[in-house]
Amino acid sequence: MWGLTVLLLPVVSFALYPEEILDTQWELWKKTYRKQYNSKGDEISRRLIWEKNLKHISIHNLEASLGVHTYELAMNHLGDMTSEEVVQKMTGLKVPASRSRSNDTLYIPDWEGRAPDSVDYRKKGYVTPVKNQGQCGSCWAFSSVGALEGQLKKKTGKLLNLSPQNLVDCVSENDGCGGGYMTNAFQYVQKNRGIDSEDAYPYVGQDENCMYNPTGKAAKCRGYREIPEGNEKALKRAVARVGPISVAIDASLTSFQFYRKGVYYDENCNSDNLNHAVLAVGYGIQKGNKHWIIKNSWGENWGNKGYILMARNKNNACGIANLASFPKM
């Protein structure tokens, strides 16, 4: 019976959306997200992608209602994009080919005492509102800024929006909207003796000339530390003891693109294919499923108001503990 039910899911899903309902939903979706297309042909091709994504979402959620998945999906502003396009235009992690970890930057966890069962830095006032990087490969800048903001709050008691555009334009070791790496950003802030606030250096979502101005400086750092590679226990300790941590993940799957709620775990997520930088702002457990609380930079229309709960202690799912780091202040 179970096998028959699963086989019937695509048929049931397709039957849920006759053509006239699809037409209505398409028009509503375009209006909701203010979508306009250059030509009729462009709109037709985008609608086909949207319909394919809608079908994927419907089938997944039917399976979730049967207990197959621990999370649900929903249509969002990325509905007319393929997962390949999302990775190309809206991620941006670029790991240096010559990257090497040294004892000078390695974070050695303090294992004394027990780490809290759950931590949420949003409730402690360490986390600024969710941002939207747009179609610029600047995830690394938003991840870095988020970690810096958390440490600034911890050290000074003040929560300020720092400038990802400052990093996009000025970190010469990275490639701006073409991609970058978080520790390069921390090194820049250290050598530059500061990073501007968002108010002083607003985000524009494209590469510009470096316009850093010391009068707008809002934070600085003394270097960075890296979590032992692939060690989720060390990452948990770092989150609990340090604050929000910059992490890298595989965000290439359609399931990630349309995540809505629940604890995200997709066995197809590749821990060796790290393409997106995000911010770990806590951890916990939901309905028996351990998770990380992750802040993304795709706006509040994505996920659960811009956040996703990602599986914790499930063989380093999506590679979340492979390239974790934080700044020292």
From Swiss-Prot:
Reaction catalysed by this enzyme: Broad proteolytic activity. With small-molecule substrates and inhibitors, the major determinant of specificity is P2, which is preferably Leu, Met > Phe, and not Arg
One Pfam family cited in the UniProt record for this chain: Inhibitor_I29
Signal peptide coordinates: 1-15
CDD domains cross-referenced by the UniProt entry: Peptidase_C1A
Keywords: Cell membrane, Disulfide bond, Glycoprotein, Hydrolase, Lysosome, Membrane, Protease, Secreted, Signal, Thiol protease, Zymogen
The protein's Enzyme Commission number: 3.4.22.38
First-tier enzyme category under EC: hydrolase
Secreted keyword on record: yes
Keyword Electron transport set for record: no
Membrane topology of this protein: Peripheral membrane protein
Location in or out of the cell: Lysosome; Secreted; Apical cell membrane
Residue positions assigned to the propeptide: 16-114
Active-site annotation: 139, 276, 296
GO MF term (any one): cysteine-type endopeptidase activity
GO BP term, pick one: proteolysis involved in protein catabolic process
InterPro entries to which the protein is assigned, alphabetical: Papain-like_cys_pep_sf, Pept_asp_AS, Pept_cys_AS, Pept_his_AS, Peptidase_C1A, Peptidase_C1A_C, Peptidase_C1A_papain-like, Prot_inhib_I29
A GO cellular component entry from the record: apical plasma membrane
Disulfide bonds: 136-177, 170-210, 269-318
PROSITE patterns xrefs: THIOL_PROTEASE_ASN (PS00640), THIOL_PROTEASE_CYS (PS00139), THIOL_PROTEASE_HIS (PS00639)
Residues bearing glycans: 103
Domain of life according to the entry: Eukaryota
Family: Belongs to the peptidase C1 family.
PANTHER family: CYSTEINE PROTEASE FAMILY C1-RELATED
Physiological role: Thiol protease involved in osteoclastic bone resorption and may participate partially in the disorder of bone remodeling. Displays potent endoprotease activity against fibrinogen at acid pH. May play an important role in extracellular matrix degradation. Involved in the release of thyroid hormone thyroxine (T4) by limited proteolysis of TG/thyroglobulin in the thyroid follicle lumen.
Protein name: Cathepsin K
